[in-house]
From Swiss-Prot:
This is Small ribosomal subunit protein uS7. Transmembrane segments: none annotated. Part of the 30S ribosomal subunit. Contacts proteins S9 and S11. It comes from Geobacillus thermodenitrificans (strain NG80-2). The gene is rpsG. The keyword Membrane does not apply. Keywords: Ribonucleoprotein, Ribosomal protein, RNA-binding, rRNA-binding, tRNA-binding. GO terms for biological process: translation. GO terms for molecular function: rRNA binding; structural constituent of ribosome; tRNA binding. Disulfide bonds: none annotated. One of the primary rRNA binding proteins, it binds directly to 16S rRNA where it nucleates assembly of the head domain of the 30S subunit. Is located at the subunit interface close to the decoding center, probably blocks exit of the E-site tRNA. Belongs to the universal ribosomal protein uS7 family. Pfam families: Ribosomal_S7.
Length: 156
């Protein structure tokens, strides 16, 4: 924790096409080595694929996917008397969004399709339908929290 008080939270600018801060945050998560224009191209192409395959607005599909991926509970390690306990805690709203975006990109990269655009589009569509690896990650996180419910009184 810094000695000079809390660090100011940086605000991201909405993206030029969809005018959404969420889309900008997703672009930043996709970006590797500062290549933002490449990340934008990947996301916008993925959105075009989603529009083509579903016939729906890609923003609606993306928002539904994010809603299905964001965790409500997670476990955090807490040391009590020489033992480490996995204590279930609620996830802060900003962290929920961050984890959701991170998992969408992370599990898109692990998919088998040829291009990143296809992988991302398919992962977003799967997540919107409550399937896919990112949704499974959320379910696993919730299961861990449920399994460690007995240690909930160690919350801080």
């Amino acid at each position: 924790m810094p000695r000079r008080g809390p660090v100011a939270k940086r605000d991201v600018l909405p993206d030029p096409i969809y005018n959404s801060k969420l889309v900008t945050r997703l672009i930043n998560k996709i970006m590797i080595d500062g290549k933002k224009s490449k990340a934008q191209k990947i996301l916008y192409t993925a959105f075009d694929i989603i529009r083509e395959r579903t016939g729906k607005d890609p923003m609606e599909v993306f928002e539904q996917a994010l809603k299905n991926v964001m965790p409500v509970l997670e476990v955090r390690a807490r040391r009590v008397g020489g033992a480490n306990y996995q204590v279930p805690v609620e996830v802060r709203p900003d962290r929920r969004v961050s984890l959701g975006l991170r998992w969408l990109v992370q599990y898109s990269r692990l998919r088998g399709e040829k291009t990143m655009e296809e992988r991302l589009a398919n992962e977003i569509m799967d997540a919107a339908n409550n399937t896919g690896a990112a949704v499974k990650k959320r379910e696993d996180t919730h299961k861990m929290a449920e399994a460690n419910k007995a240690f909930a009184h160690y919350r801080w």
